[in-house]
Swiss-Prot record:
CC terms in the record's Gene Ontology section: cytosol; mitochondrion
Lineage: Eukaryota, Metazoa, Chordata, Craniata, Vertebrata
Protein name (record): COX assembly mitochondrial protein 2 homolog
Subcellular location: Mitochondrion
Extent of motif Cx9C motif 2: 37-47
Chain ranges of the CHCH domain: 11-55
């Protein structure tokens, strides 16, 4: 199962791959069960993972800045 694939949650790159996957599923509604769209699906999952890791890194940096600012204000 994929996470929410709403366009406002993802980068343009991932949105393009998501739309290609949806198009593939629509055009090949039977072949999709036999792996016809698997390559696009793998690319989408790789893009979503990269996005997730980037968000995680950004949040970690933000948290560290907040902690450092809090420690500096205590001194």
């Amino acid at each position: 199962m994929h996470p929410d694939l709403s366009p406002h949650l993802h980068t343009e790159e991932c949105n393009l791959i998501i739309s290609l996957l949806k198009k593939c599923h629509k055009e090949h509604n039977v072949l999709k069960f036999f792996g016809h769209c698997n390559d696009i699906d793998r690319e989408m999952r790789k893009c979503l993972k990269k996005e997730f890791e980037e968000n995680r890194r950004r949040n970690r940096e933000k948290r560290q800045r907040i902690i450092n600012a809090h420690k500096a204000s205590e001194k």
